[in-house]
Amino acid sequence: MESFEVSSIDLKVFGKWDTKVEIRDPSLKKYIGLMPVYLPHTGGRHEHRRFGKAKLPIVERLINNVMRPGRNKGKKMLAYNIVKTAFDIIALKTGQNPIQVLVKAIENSAPREEVTRIMYGGIVYYVAVDVAPQRRVDLALRHLVMGAKEASFNNPKPIEEALAEEIIAAASNDPKSFAIRKKEEIERIALSSR
């Protein structure tokens, strides 16, 4: 029987995409999981560990966000196939590694500043605060998926195509992207309440 070393096996996401990508934002490096996995499905092993979701592959976190309440709630295989098809579309349209495009989209659409409510003596103040890196990634993924769902709802365009277009638009910092618009809105509100 042959023995294989784990390091010698070249794992790629969906059997196609390499996870050796560049993260330019230093604050997000720890929170964008790029470990090589063939099937991004950990089954909630991170659930009870503090900052456990930071170790989750970023593709799986995208899949989990596609499963948000609504039509796709709890249907992980459907979400998996949506993301897989969206990645194929991204590769066809851009000619780049879709994981690199996704990471760039997350970097561009992650808000840096937001508003929090502070109650002081019965009066509510809105104060601008910096966003934690983990929350930046969470918000970016959520807004990317929300934009895709909004674009494909009551529309003949399939969600796979909408998700691919949203990720490509966010990666190129296009103001037509829902995630970029949402980020700018959050930062504008934070700027006004400094």
Curated annotation (Swiss-Prot):
<dbReference type="InterPro" id="IPR000235">
    <property type="entry name" value="Ribosomal_uS7"/>
</dbReference>
<dbReference type="GO" id="GO:0019843">
    <property type="term" value="F:rRNA binding"/>
</dbReference>
<dbReference type="GO" id="GO:0015935">
    <property type="term" value="C:small ribosomal subunit"/>
</dbReference>
<dbReference type="InterPro" id="IPR036823">
    <property type="entry name" value="Ribosomal_uS7_dom_sf"/>
</dbReference>
<keyword id="KW-0694">RNA-binding</keyword>
<comment type="similarity">
    <text>Belongs to the universal ribosomal protein uS7 family.</text>
</comment>
<dbReference type="GO" id="GO:0003735">
    <property type="term" value="F:structural constituent of ribosome"/>
</dbReference>
<keyword id="KW-0699">rRNA-binding</keyword>
<dbReference type="InterPro" id="IPR026018">
    <property type="entry name" value="Ribosomal_uS7_arc"/>
</dbReference>
<dbReference type="InterPro" id="IPR020606">
    <property type="entry name" value="Ribosomal_uS7_CS"/>
</dbReference>
<dbReference type="InterPro" id="IPR005716">
    <property type="entry name" value="Ribosomal_uS7_euk/arc"/>
</dbReference>
<dbReference type="GO" id="GO:0006412">
    <property type="term" value="P:translation"/>
</dbReference>
<comment type="function">
    <text>One of the primary rRNA binding proteins, it binds directly to 16S rRNA where it nucleates assembly of the head domain of the 30S subunit. Is located at the subunit interface close to the decoding center.</text>
</comment>
<keyword id="KW-0689">Ribosomal protein</keyword>
<dbReference type="InterPro" id="IPR023798">
    <property type="entry name" value="Ribosomal_uS7_dom"/>
</dbReference>
<keyword id="KW-0687">Ribonucleoprotein</keyword>
<dbReference type="Pfam" id="PF00177">
    <property type="entry name" value="Ribosomal_S7"/>
</dbReference>
<comment type="subunit">
    <text>Part of the 30S ribosomal subunit.</text>
</comment>
<protein>
    <recommendedName>
        <fullName>Small ribosomal subunit protein uS7</fullName>
    </recommendedName>
</protein>
